[in-house]
């Protein structure tokens, strides 16, 4: 009698584990379908190359005259890389901060100022880069994305996030923000050894 109860409890636990595993598989399949559909739509819309797999997808091509490469994986999230002309050879690191719950509906300037930590080898470069309000406004919504990092090293501008974004409008928002940032970086040039 006791052995029968132990067997039934064990079978019940096994059945629950199997149901949980099946639910996870169905959820992963739905996410993968949405991912392929969203990324494929963006690639098709802008004439880019889309490569899909079960656990990773990538988009390669040109966007507003810049070479881009976007890679997404289930485990690591997403990385987007874009070429730019970094005439001043500066470095840049933008990290999204954890926003306090008291900051409910901030304006773009407040969101940008409190939502990001900015680092560079040159404070003058940072000041000149973010002098334009339109660039700060374009980047400000990205501060709401936990773990987001944007870096500039050499001629490569890179965005990474631990979350996988699957919708084409989300990817387009990243592309537009990165393109505006690249344009701002390119506008800072050396003239006779001095920045203008």
Region spans (language model):
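Charged, low-complexity intrinsically disordered regions
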Residues: 10, 36-77, 81, 85-196
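Transmembrane-cytosolic junction motif
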Residues: 17-45
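Feature marks short, highly hydrophobic, charge-poor N-terminal signal-anchor/signal peptide-like helices
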Residues: 1-12
């Amino acid at each position: 009698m006791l052995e029968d109860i132990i067997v039934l409890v064990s079978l019940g636990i096994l059945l629950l584990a199997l149901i949980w595993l099946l639910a996870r598989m169905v959820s992963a399949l739905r996410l993968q379908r949405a991912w392929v559909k969203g990324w494929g739509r963006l690639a098709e819309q802008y004439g880019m190359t889309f490569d899909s797999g079960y656990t990773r997808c990538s988009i390669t091509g040109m966007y507003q005259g810049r070479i881009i490469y976007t890679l997404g994986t289930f485990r690591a999230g997403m990385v987007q890389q874009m070429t730019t002309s970094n005439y001043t050879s500066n470095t840049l690191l933008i990290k999204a901060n954890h926003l306090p719950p008291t900051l409910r509906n901030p304006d773009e300037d407040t969101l940008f100022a409190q939502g990001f930590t900015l680092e560079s080898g040159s404070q003058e470069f940072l000041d000149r880069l973010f002098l334009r309000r339109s660039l700060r406004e374009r980047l400000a919504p990205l501060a709401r994305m936990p773990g987001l990092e944007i870096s500039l090293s050499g001629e490569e501008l890179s965005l990474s996030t631990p979350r996988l974004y699957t919708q084409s409008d989300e990817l387009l928002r990243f592309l537009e923000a990165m393109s505006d940032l690249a344009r701002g970086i390119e506008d800072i040039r050396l003239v006779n050894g001095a920045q203008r």
